[in-house]
Regions:
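Short "lid" loop at the C-terminus of a central beta-strand within the Rossmann-like core
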Residues: 16, 20, 56-58, 138-143, ...
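Class I SAM-dependent methyltransferase SAM/SAH-binding core
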Residues: 36, 40-94
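A short glycine-rich, Lys/Arg-flanked "PGG" loop and its adjoining helix->strand segment in the class I
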Residues: 117-132
Length: 168
């Protein structure tokens, strides 16, 4: 089984390779489409606190949210102080109070963390009872997912992430 990009691993250049892919036309097109979709969802969600865990490119996915308290949590130290990073965290133990977030956004994070089930349990812990989870990910049964399998591009970002089916 190919190795996943571990965005929480500072010792590798996996995160940098993923950012390079996102700067290419196909990556930019994907980011733009996801920004549009998320921009249609977030304004409909109300609350006091919205949290984006991880980043997937240069776009501000939270800009369309009406929620005023916006937090980005990264698993790697911020290299750029102007990046908007407000919180560093660990994927297996989020430093956020239980039942404190109204909305959590996970842009392709589950595909690249070492323990996605643990992260989902942590997200469930921090969400309020009627909170919302907004997730993005690659569909393994889409054309891109099948292309990945046929060409065995599993060693190159973003294709070396673990793609989860919608039914899962």
């Amino acid at each position: 089984m190919p190795e996943k990009i571990n965005i929480a691993d500072d010792s590798s250049t996996a995160g940098e390779k993923l950012r390079q892919w996102l700067s290419r036309p196909l990556g930019q097109s994907l980011q733009s489409e996801e920004q549009n979709r998320i921009s249609n969802i977030l304004p409909k969600l109300f609350g006091y606190h919205v949290l984006q865990i991880g980043d997937f490119g240069e776009l501000d996915l939270l800009e369309s949210s009406r929620i005023s308290h916006k937090i980005r949590m990264l698993f790697n130290p911020c290299e750029d102080t102007d990046s908007g990073c407000t919180l560093l965290g660990d994927e297996e133990s989020l430093a956020i109070a239980s039942h404190s977030m109204d909305v959590v956004v996970l842009p392709h994070v589950l595909e690249f963390v070492s323990n996605p089930h643990k992260l989902l349990r942590e997200v469930e812990r921090i969400l309020i009872g009627e909170g919302h989870l907004v997730l993005t990910g690659f569909n393994p049964w889409s054309l891109w997912g099948l292309w990945r399998l046929l060409l065995l591009w599993r060693e190159m970002p973003p294709w070396n992430g673990h793609f989860y089916a919608y039914t899962r």
